[in-house]
Amino acid sequence: MRLSRTFLATLLLSPLVPIAARAQDLGIDVGAKAPAVSVQSLDGKRVSLGDYIGKTPMLIEFWATWCPNCKELMPTLLDAEKKFGKQVKFVAIAVAINQSPEKVRRWLAAHPLPHDTFYDVEGKAAGAFDAPATSYVVVLDKTGKVVYTGLGGKQDLEGAIRKAL
């Protein structure tokens, strides 16, 4: 009976191995040139990420007010911004899933952030960066090349930023 339980567990879990291995490969390719897509400011004005890309190293986080991984990542993100904020442009892109610009504005009023926050109304930025989920971080070097992508509440943002400097 013991062998059959082990066999059954292996059989049930083996399809998950490729998914776990592929998790690090999700998103825009490291080495790719970042797309200069447009997003919106929280007051509805069109903003092109191309205005920032290629001018200075940049950290972009795709996030949501309701995302637990984003909340877990926030202290690490703020520490990195405090340390590297004069050298790196930090940008948050709020995804348009279960939140509105108004909800994001209310959240930011209660939890002020030191960096620019934009809204991805049509999901074009998330699509262009192939963002697999919220808490997805992309770090660009000063030429606009992707040097890091990561997902989840525990990321080495300081190490990622050092790759861009």
Where are these regions (language model features)?
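N-proximal helix/coil linker or "cap" segments that precede and/or mark the start of modular domains
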Residues: T10-A36, R106
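Short, acidic, Ser/Thr-enriched surface-loop or helix-capping motifs
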Residues: I28, S41-L42, L140-D141
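A short beta-strand-turn-helix
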Residues: V37-M58
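Thiol/disulfide oxidoreductase modules built on the thioredoxin-like
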Residues: G54, W107-P114, D120-A164
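Hydrophobic beta-strand anchors of alpha/beta hydrolase catalytic cores
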Residues: L59-I60, F90, V137
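Structural microenvironment flanking redox-active thiols in thiol-disulfide oxidoreductases
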Residues: K71-H111, V121-A128
